From Swiss-Prot:
Assembly mode: Homodimer.
Annotated active site: K66
Database matches in InterPro entries: Aminoacid_DH-like_N_sf, NAD(P)-bd_dom_sf, Shikimate_DH, Shikimate_DH-bd_N, Shikimate_DH_fam, Shikm_DH/Glu-tRNA_Rdtase
GO biological process, one term: chorismate biosynthetic process
EC number annotated for this UniProt entry: 1.1.1.25
Superkingdom to which the source organism belongs: Bacteria
Protein name: Shikimate dehydrogenase (NADP(+))
Reaction(s) the record says it catalyses: shikimate + NADP(+) = 3-dehydroshikimate + NADPH + H(+)
Amino acid sequence: MTKQFAVIGNPIEQSRSPELHHAFAEKTGVDLNYQKRLAPLDGFESSMRSFFAKGGSGMNVTVPFKEQAFALCDVLTERAQIAKAVNTLWMENGKLHGDNTDGQGLVAAIQALEWNLENTTILILGAGGATRGVIYPLVQAGAKKIVIANRTLARAEQLVDDLKTAVPQAQLQAISLNDLEGDFDIVINATSASLSGDALQLPEKLKFKYAYEMAYGKPSSFLDQAKQRNVPYAEGFGMLVGQAIEAFSIWNNVRPQLKDFL
């Protein structure tokens, strides 16, 4: 019997999840159908519950419903609890389970690039939900210190305070985007600057070996500056594929290989 999956969001037209999951299915022999599902901004819960009531096997959640999905889950993975957002849902024994695979997607993408994560010092630009979701997996993968830089320093400080309890083994620090300096192994752009076209200027006194842009398929002043410095760089398509593979493997107990889809 064909398993039914979906990705839910608003907007949803831009999602590449169906093509990825159908490609994974073809590679692994899983019989599935995966659809885009547009939910009204005030209609996420009813749309999601209707999908599972009709026999849906699993659902991905995208903007702007990840925090709402988190709040509705009966059972959460540890990384979802820390992220306070859920992008992967499934029903098990009548209970709604939730996970957040974004951080693992980022880790898998970085590892596929053969950038070392062990004992690294990482700078993340931005202190929103995208950053919160990746801290724990980065630490699990070996990152030694993570510095979070944000335009509003108080927001970065709040995030660090929240995460210090959840991820006590990590060295976490908050700074202002105006105070970017020092040496880092990897800089990750998790700000919406690339999406909105706001140019984020990286000062000369900020040094880094690698640059990762979470967004993909759009012009990025962040990556332009990495190119000018001749620093190895990548955009977020690998992260997208990585998080999709993680969700696929949770639902289907088979894991496609990331390298086959990059």
